[in-house]
């Protein structure tokens, strides 16, 4: 017979914050949102500390290279999705680690034979008005020219005109060489009154572009999450099947932390995965685990050696695990229970294992609630899927710009080894749906507004 939990199971929406006393010192600038990402012993410091308590979900529709760079710039961390081949995931991790701050790889690249109408469509799709022209249309092709909004007039010009007829050709461009520093690139931009500076290699292949508009942003990112080599930090998702093949590639690519991505974390399969990582890498490779919804699940994974533990089953906005399997728990109740277990575990063992609240965030204030309930940080899917930096298309739905968003348990994500219990057999069990989320512009604007709000709160919970 099943065990019945006494009391009710609550979601975040059933709680409110009672504002506490605000002194003259209680201002956002005096608040630090730094939080541990990985386990540590009493008296020691964690190996990895987040500068803001936010990480992006291990999802195809959320966490790609652009999200990895953008979120690390703001002090959080992105977990590259594992529902792809080990080689392609490792390549994404490497791209984030190799990213040179300020040098942007174009995702709006043209060929000379494209038409003005295609340029306009690409501008509408990406929002970018500066587009390099390369011989093969790739971001690393040979640079032939550049197109900006000043090179054509849609209201007067022939929309069938070829790019090669109105682009600014290579011989008229000022470019930077592959060894140029960001400071020097910005100097060239200002001295020559440029809006953008293409950077090329010895063979004139495009490496990236430095934009004038980014100059100030690089001076106003004190929260950047960097490793000891001043590279952006990034995480990566793994599963309980191919870890022996995947983990070495991710470690070689430079992943700072791994996380087992599963809808059910209280399992022998997660234990085996963590044990394999420890046997092959010791404590050098950090690995989080989950998801669980009670104290027993937390203690199991903590004893297995998980560096952090995710809480939440079925609470995601596009997750239907509760409807299809009948398992889960109200996110607020689960979080309170697990955080209490974390504190008890720390008192008993002297080891602090951070808790990540994963799912159940419907409104922004729910994040403040999650932190007030004890979460060390939050993993967010829908919230980050709305921004420019998520990997999905921006589309127009009934006159409103939206971004595509789908769950890792959906048919679209192909159930890529996540929603199972491990072992050799593969299941095809739909636990997520496809959807759209309202487009919200750049991540920087949204996150800055949010963590300023979180820092201003000094609540009690009712």
Positions of the model-derived regions?
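Hydrophobic faces of well-ordered beta-strands that scaffold small-molecule active sites
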Residues: 54-57, 78-80, 232-238, 258, ...
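Glycine-rich phosphate-binding active-site loops on the catalytic face of alpha/beta enzymes
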Residues: 79-85, 262-265, 311-325, 369, ...
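Single conserved hydrophobic/aromatic residue that forms the stacking wall/gate
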Residues: 451, 455-462
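Bateman/CBS regulatory modules and CBS-like beta-alpha motifs in cytosolic regions of diverse proteins
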Residues: 27-50, 57-59, 88-128, 133-136, ...
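Alpha/beta catalytic cores of nucleotide-metabolism and tRNA/nucleoside-modifying enzymes
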Residues: 1-24, 108-111, 176-177, 183-187, ...
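Short beta->alpha transition motifs characteristic of CBS
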Residues: 80-85, 142-158, 194, 198, ...
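N-terminal capping/small domains of soluble enzymes
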Residues: 1-117, 125, 423-453
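Active-site-adjacent beta->alpha loops and helix N-cap segments on the catalytic face
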Residues: 86-92, 212-223, 244, 264-281, ...
């Amino acid at each position: 017979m099943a065990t019945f939990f006494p009391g009710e199971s609550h979601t975040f929406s059933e709680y409110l914050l009672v504002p506490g006393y605000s002194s003259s010192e209680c201002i956002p600038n005096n608040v630090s949102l730094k939080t541990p990402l990985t386990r540590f012993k009493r008296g020691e410091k964690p190996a990895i500390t987040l500068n803001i308590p936010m990480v992006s979900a291990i999802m195809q529709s959320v966490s790609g290279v652009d999200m990895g760079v953008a979120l690390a710039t703001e002090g959080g961390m992105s977990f590259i999705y594992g529902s792809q081949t080990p080689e392609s995931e490792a390549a994404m991790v490497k791209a984030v680690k190799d990213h040179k701050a300020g040098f942007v790889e174009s995702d709006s690249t043209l060929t000379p034979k494209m038409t003005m109408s295609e340029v306009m469509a690409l501008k509408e799709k990406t929002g970018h008005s500066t587009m390099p022209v390369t011989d093969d249309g790739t971001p690393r092709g040979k640079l032939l020219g550049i197109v900006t909004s000043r090179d054509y007039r849609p209201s007067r010009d022939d929309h069938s005109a070829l790019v090669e007829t109105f682009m600014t050709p290579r011989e008229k461009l000022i470019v930077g060489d592959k060894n140029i520093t960001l400071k020097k690139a910005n100097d060239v931009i200002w001295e020559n009154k440029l809006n953008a500076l293409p950077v090329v290699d010895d063979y004139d292949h495009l490496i990236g572009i430095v934009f004038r508009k980014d100059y100030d942003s690089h001076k106003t990112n004190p929260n950047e999450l960097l490793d000891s080599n001043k590279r952006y930090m990034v995480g990566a998702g793994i599963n309980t099947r191919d870890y022996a093949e995947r983990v070495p590639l991710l470690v070689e690519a430079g992943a700072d932390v791994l996380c087992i991505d599963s809808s059910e974390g209280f399992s022998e399969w997660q234990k085996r995965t963590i044990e394999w990582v420890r046997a092959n890498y010791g404590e050098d490779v950090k690995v989080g685990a989950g998801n669980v919804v009670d104290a027993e699940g937390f203690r199991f994974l903590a004893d297995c050696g998980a560096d952090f533990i995710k809480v939440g089953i079925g609470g995601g906005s596009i997750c239907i695990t509760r409807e299809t399997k009948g398992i889960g728990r109200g996110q607020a109740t689960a979080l309170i229970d697990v955080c209490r277990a974390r504190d008890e575990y720390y008192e008993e063992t002297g080891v602090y294992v951070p808790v990540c609240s994963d799912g159940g965030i419907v409104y922004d204030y729910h994040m403040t609630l999650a932190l007030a309930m004890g979460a060390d940080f939050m993993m967010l899917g829908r919230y980050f899927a709305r921004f420019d930096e998520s990997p999905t298309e921006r589309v127009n739905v009934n006159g409103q710009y939206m971004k595509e968003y789908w769950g890792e348990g959906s048919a679209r994500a192909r159930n890529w080894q996540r929603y199972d219990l491990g072992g050799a057999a593969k299941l095809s069990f739909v636990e997520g749906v496809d959807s759209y989320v309202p487009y919200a512009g750049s991540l920087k604007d949204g996150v800055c507004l949010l963590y300023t709000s979180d820092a201003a709160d000094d609540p009690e919970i009712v």
